[in-house]
């Protein structure tokens, strides 16, 4: 076949397969048999192999998966992928409605959607072509899993409109696919997946896209993150638009004109959810009007215009076999119930937290008891109560120890606390847990250093404190179980990258008592070098908004310890950054004088000097509000390179337009 003939045939096959795939996977209305579809796909693959220069990353043939990837790259989300606040009762929903109406008035309506139990994803399209897909990650930074997402048939590779946009959705594994996968794993002598959510997440984190393609995943799209050249006034209007350009939208979504209708919708799914072909763990309720959403805004963690109703936790009965003790990084000794394995909310549960000695005494929990277990919020296993009527007389009371189970030091109960605590700073359990915390995502974010690797390193005597992580070498790491050369090289690169982390990550990672990630950011903004923070007095600390007396006293006490100062000096000598890299705190007077104060700003095009996330953070610190689309309410558009339809629309609406140079100048003053 001549090249020109092949090109025409390939394009025809692609169009046919796209149309058949859309009807089968999105509309659930197949036009041809599976055998006919497979025959056309094989014909396309053969032609693309014969003419490799005609291959395309939007061809339906990529659904079968490409070559294995060396690792997943990290990518920054254009706008953060926030979590949602939770509701557990009708009253919680009414309270949410009351808070909304206090801000926007009584003319509020809602969009309701099933909360799919899967993996949150972000998809980016440029001129209608799928160019990047990522996991949620920590909400700001995720992993690029584009190649694996291309294998999901319901995710369009080309849209029906040449639009540039970002959408949010949920990738999931249908129940039928999950059952088939577990049957295959069992037949192969492998461990079964606990639930479809874990199976979906594991499938999308396969480095070999061909394996992901065999897992038969699906995806629903539920929101637009940003879109160029399209003004949408409501959430349900946005969903309808997404459907028309080729996305799979959950047909069970509903528009509700009052909170009573929302509650009826929620309650209707309490029984019906078991009949769905996929798992759901609740209902998402969103204020429908986009302008109302903007008025309500966001907290640090979630939008104020949306909430997730979580279904009541499933409760089951099992036997409490034993109570074991765990020592955390702060020395708190937590009793854990060891249970006869039981399935709760689709997950095999073997352990549940008992929190502290007072709870054990209060519930009269004994070894051998029959207990009721549930998963609070369908996440954390919890012992609800004891079925004392089932006791046989062989059950044994449990007493908390007087000494640490890890190091033997005497346990203490600090004033005002119910927990028993080991106060030995050399306790191996505390050191190990502290190391795990230091490398975690919100702290130094060292990929490849999970709990198992840290435990191995610690038990082999290769690390004793966090500074030792930066002294690890290739030969030492190759001695560990399941660590090949590629894994070791990636890990060493990740350790090296973490040295550049901003000061707030290091502060959070050090595990100073009472200092969470938000407080660490506040401290770093006000004391932008480790030297300044180490010298800060108690009075200087409590003068900072959000730093209370207890936290200030803890920080002063922490930096008074010689071993702490030795550790920090050692980290600095190993090249770990000791300065704050983010925007400086802005005073009220400076905000009032800012060119962004009270203005709605839109960013478009590629920025060179800083990322969109950095620009957004700095504009908002100076009193501005950054949104994703241009409208009559937009005050200012910042246009980077290759600015598209947003720039055109801004000109039509006579909106003020800046280039990147003007932006950098404004945020630098």
From Swiss-Prot:
Its cofactor is Mg(2+); Mn(2+). The keyword DNA repair applies. The active site is at 115 (n6-amp-lysine intermediate). GO terms for biological process: DNA repair; DNA replication. GO terms for cellular component: cytosol. InterPro entries: BRCT_dom (IPR001357), BRCT_dom_sf (IPR036420), DisA/LigA_HHH (IPR041663), DNA_ligase (IPR001679), DNA_ligase_AS (IPR018239), DNA_ligase_CS (IPR033136), DNAligase_adenylation (IPR013839), DNAligase_N (IPR013840). It catalyses: NAD(+) + (deoxyribonucleotide)n-3'-hydroxyl + 5'-phospho-(deoxyribonucleotide)m = (deoxyribonucleotide)n+m + AMP + beta-nicotinamide D-nucleotide. NAD(+) binds at residues 34-38, 83-84, 113, 136, 170, 286, 310. It holds the Pfam family DNA_ligase_ZBD. GO terms for molecular function: DNA binding; DNA ligase (NAD+) activity; metal ion binding. Its EC number is 6.5.1.2. Zn(2+) binds at residues 404, 407, 422, 427. It is an enzyme of class 6 (ligase). It comes from the Bacteria. This is DNA ligase. The gene is ligA.
């Amino acid at each position: 076949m001549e090249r020109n003939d092949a090109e025409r045939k390939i394009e025809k096959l692609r169009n046919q397969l796209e149309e058949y795939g859309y009807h089968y996977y999105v509309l659930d209305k197949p036009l041809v048999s599976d055998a006919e579809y497979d025959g056309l796909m094989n014909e396309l693959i053969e032609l693309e192999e014969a003419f490799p220069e005609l291959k395309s990353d939007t061809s339906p043939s990529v659904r079968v998966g490409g070559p294995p990837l060396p690792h997943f790259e990290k990518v920054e989300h254009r706008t953060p992928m926030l979590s949602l606040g939770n509701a557990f009762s009708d009253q919680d929903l009414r309270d949410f409605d009351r808070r909304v109406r206090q801000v926007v008035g009584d003319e509020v309506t809602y969009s309701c959607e099933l909360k799919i139990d899967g993996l949150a994803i972000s998809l980016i399209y440029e001129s209608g072509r799928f160019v990047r897909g990522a996991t949620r990650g920590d909400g700001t930074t995720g992993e690029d899993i584009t190649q694996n997402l291309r294998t999901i048939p319901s995710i369009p590779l080309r849209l029906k409109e040449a639009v540039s946009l970002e959408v949010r959705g949920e990738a999931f594994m249908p129940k039928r696919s999950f059952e088939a996968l577990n049957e295959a794993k069992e037949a192969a002598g492998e461990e079964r997946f606990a639930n479809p959510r874990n199976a979906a997440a594991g499938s999308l984190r396969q480095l070999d896209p061909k394996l992901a393609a065999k897992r038969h995943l699906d995806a629903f799209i539920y929101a637009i993150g940003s879109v160029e050249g399209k003004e949408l006034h409501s959430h349900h209007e946005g969903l309808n638009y997404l459907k028309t350009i080729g996305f799979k939208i959950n047909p069970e979504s509903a528009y509700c004109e009052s909170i009573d209708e929302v509650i009826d919708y929620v309650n209707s799914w309490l029984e019906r959810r078991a009949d769905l072909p996929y798992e759901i763990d609740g209902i998402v309720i969103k204020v429908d009007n986009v302008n109302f959403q903007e008025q309500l805004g966001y907290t640090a963690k979630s939008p104020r215009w949306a909430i997730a109703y979580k279904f009541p936790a499933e409760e089951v009965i099992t036997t409490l076999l034993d109570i074991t003790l765990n020592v955390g990084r702060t020395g708190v000794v937590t009793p854990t119930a060891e249970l006869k394995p039981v399935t709760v909310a689709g997950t095999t549960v073997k352990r549940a937290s008992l929190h502290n000695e007072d709870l054990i005494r209060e519930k009269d929990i004994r070894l051998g008891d029959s207990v009721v277990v549930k998963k609070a919020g369908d996440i954390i296993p919890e012992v609800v109560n004891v079925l004392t009527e089932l006791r046989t007389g062989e059950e044994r009371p449990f007493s908390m120890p007087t000494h640490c189970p890890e190091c033997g030091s005497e346990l203490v109960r600090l004033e005002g606390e119910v927990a028993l605590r080991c106060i030995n700073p050399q306790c191996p359990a505390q050191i190990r847990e502290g190391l795990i915390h230091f490398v975690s995502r919100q702290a130094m974010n060292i990929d490849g250093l999970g709990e198992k690797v840290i435990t191995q390193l610690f038990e082999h005597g290769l690390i004793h404190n966090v500074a030792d992580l930066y002294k690890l070498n290739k030969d030492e790491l190759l001695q560990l179980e399941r660590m090949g050369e590629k894994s070791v090289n990636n890990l060493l690169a990740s350790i090296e990258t973490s040295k550049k982390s901003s000061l707030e990550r290091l502060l959070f990672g050090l595990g100073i008592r009472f200092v969470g990630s938000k407080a660490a950011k506040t401290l770093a903004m006000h004391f932008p070098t480790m030297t300044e923070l180490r010298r800060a007095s108690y009075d200087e600390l409590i003068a900072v908004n959000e730093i209370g007396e207890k936290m200030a006293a803890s920080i002063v006490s922490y930096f008074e310890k010689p071993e702490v100062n030795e550790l920090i000096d050692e980290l600095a000598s190993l090249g770990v950054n000791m300065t704050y890299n983010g925007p400086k705190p802005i005073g009220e007077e400076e905000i009032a004088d800012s060119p962004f104060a009270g203005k709605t700003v839109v960013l478009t095009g590629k920025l060179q000097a800083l990322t969109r996330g950095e620009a957004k953070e700095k504009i908002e610190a100076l009193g501005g509000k950054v949104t994703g689309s241009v409208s009559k309410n937009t005050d200012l558009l910042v246009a980077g390179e290759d600015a598209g339809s947003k720039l055109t629309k801004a000109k039509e609406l006579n909106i003020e337009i800046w280039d990147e140079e003007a932006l950098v100048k404004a945020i630098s003053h």
